[in-house]
């Protein structure tokens, strides 16, 4: 029984090696690539961007607003006050649990 399993495993390995070693294209055939649709179109800026602004004229308050239609709590790492509030909630929960004992 074990010898049959070993033979089947070796045949599977040989088949996998044969399939992996097969050429993808026949001799002389050139691969076809997808067309780059829209490659010549200009990149559209974000709706809140202003081309007249330079780095010096950039309004830093825009960084506090959520990007596009993303929910405000999508990236709490950018808002340290969220982390402070979250830590305070955890501390109050742990302290209330210890007073019940």
Curated annotation (Swiss-Prot):
Residues 88-101 have a biased composition (Polar residues). Residues 75-87 have a biased composition (Basic and acidic residues). Residues 1-21 form the signal peptide. It is found in: Secreted. GO terms for cellular component: extracellular region. Residues 26-101 are annotated as: Disordered. Belongs to the anophelin family. Interacts with human F2 (thrombin); the interaction results in thrombin inhibition. This is Salivary thrombin inhibitor anophelin. The lineage of its organism: Eukaryota, Metazoa, Ecdysozoa, Arthropoda, Hexapoda.
């Amino acid at each position: 029984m074990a010898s049959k399993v070993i033979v089947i495993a070796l045949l599977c390995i040989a088949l996998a090696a044969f399939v992996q070693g097969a050429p993808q294209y026949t001799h002389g055939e050139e691969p076809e690539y997808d067309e780059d649709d829209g490659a010549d179109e200009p990149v559209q800026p974000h709706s809140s961007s202003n081309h007249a602004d330079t780095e010096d004229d950039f309004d830093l308050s825009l960084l506090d607003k959520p990007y596009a239609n993303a929910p405000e709590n999508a990236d709490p790492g950018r808002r340290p006050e969220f982390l402070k509030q979250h830590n305070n909630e955890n501390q109050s929960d742990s302290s209330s649990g210890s007073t019940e004992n």
